[in-house]
Amino acid sequence: MADTTILDTTCSSTLAANVEFSHATDSAIGISLKNATITEAEGVPNLKETGYDCVRYMGTCNGGQIYLGRERKKLKDYVAIKKFAIDDVDDYAAIAKESSNLRLMHHPNIIELCECFVYERSIYQITPAMNLGSLFDIVFEYMKWGINEKSAAAITRQLLDALSYLHQRRYIHRDLKPKHILIDSSGNVKLSGFRFMIELNHHLDCVFEFDAHLQNQLYYLAPEVLAQNIHGYTSKSDIYMLGISICEAINGVMPFGELEPLEMLHRKLNGQVPRPVDMISLKDDQKMGLDISHRPQEHLTRRFSKEMHEFIANCLDYDPQQRGSASDLKSSAWLGSKIHKNLGPVDVRQELNLDYAHFDLSLWEQEPLIPMEPDQKYEIVFDYSPIS
């Protein structure tokens, strides 16, 4: 049985990438092992023998480098190319695990793998180029005070489609956050970050595992995950992470982000629930004696719907049994309302209202300076053929 894993990457660069690596054992899925030459001046690998052109270096992410590329047979199709050095057995295993997870996924709102191969001691992963980057990128770079309600609803609807698909197959994502929500200029939303996905046991609807690497996601994790008690946690923990992520996108800041981890843990385990920041929630804060004078005018004057407040409150309910399922939330009062019922990718594009000409990947294209290289000897260790 093939051990395949997807590596997801979202980063604060114009190009957001997520790619899958497949590590073959005894199936048709496999690895192509070759030697690569990298231009020191440009940092651009020569991948022509693999069927891809690296257009230019874009940035770093998760210990790897990201390049904008194209498939040579389809010159109009841009891809994200990620390069990871294989210096650590644990890193290699983590990449393999993630690739294995993503291989199992076939959904329009989940990032897909195009191909993956190994050069010397580096893994290259190929995914579609999501040219707006991540939801985190969009908020951080262009929407300091957060996105509007309609764009939040349109994005949430696509995310719930992805989560419904996962949860119906008894998987828990466990790493949902704005950096793993990728968007393209057509308004398509794709969930990435599948390294920590876990499958529920056939006899239990909960799990008890707490991967050590999850400590990097503490601020997004549900109280029951942080508690690490005998009750375990279920797919409803993903719903909590969805609520935190939408709150962050709407408010422009990560909930609990100003707190030290121990204080954040204390507040979550004692039932404190973040809220969307608008004139209603700020008036409530003022009644409690809190100072709101430092709040920006954008927060003081905007007003979100009661239905949206209730939706996020339900996602962030301390009791996981009280949270709606992904399927139920799609027909909630907020997303089922006349205004939000039929939202789709076009609404994401319209409501974000960005200058999309700025995200035209052809503007980033340049002729990479690839040095002359000696004849390279390489061996195709396994044939690569995608699983349908």
UniProtKB/Swiss-Prot annotation:
ATP binds at residues 58-66, 82. The gene is strd-1. This is STE20-related kinase adapter protein strd-1. GO terms for molecular function: ATP binding; MAP kinase kinase activity; protein kinase binding; protein serine/threonine kinase activator activity. The keyword ATP-binding applies. Interacts with sad-1. Interacts with par-4. The keyword Membrane does not apply. The protein kinase domain is predicted to be catalytically inactive. Residues 52-335 form the Protein kinase domain. Belongs to the protein kinase superfamily. STE Ser/Thr protein kinase family. STE20 subfamily. Keywords: ATP-binding, Cell projection, Cytoplasm, Neurogenesis, Nucleotide-binding, Nucleus, Synapse. Disruption phenotype: Ectopic expression of pre-synaptic reporter snb-1-GFP in ASI sensory neurons. Along the dorsal nerve cord of DD motoneurons, pre-synaptic puncta appear diffuse or smaller and synapse localization of sad-1 is disrupted. Germline hyperplasia and loss of aak-2 phosphorylation during dauer development. During neuroblast division, daughter cell size asymmetry in the Q.p division is defective. Animals are slightly stiff but with active locomotion. In par-4 (it33) mutants, causes embryonic lethality. Signal peptide: none annotated. One of its GO terms (biological process) is synapse organization. Pseudokinase which may act as an adapter for kinases sad-1 and par-4 and thereby is involved in several developmental processes. Regulates cell-autonomously both neuronal polarity and synaptic organization when bound to sad-1. Required for sad-1 localization to synapses. Required to establish germline stem cell (GSC) quiescence during dauer development, to promote cell shedding during embryogenesis and to control asymmetric cell division of the Q.p neuroblast lineage, probably when bound to par-4. May be involved in maintaining the integrity of the early embryonic cortex when bound to par-4. Its main location: other.
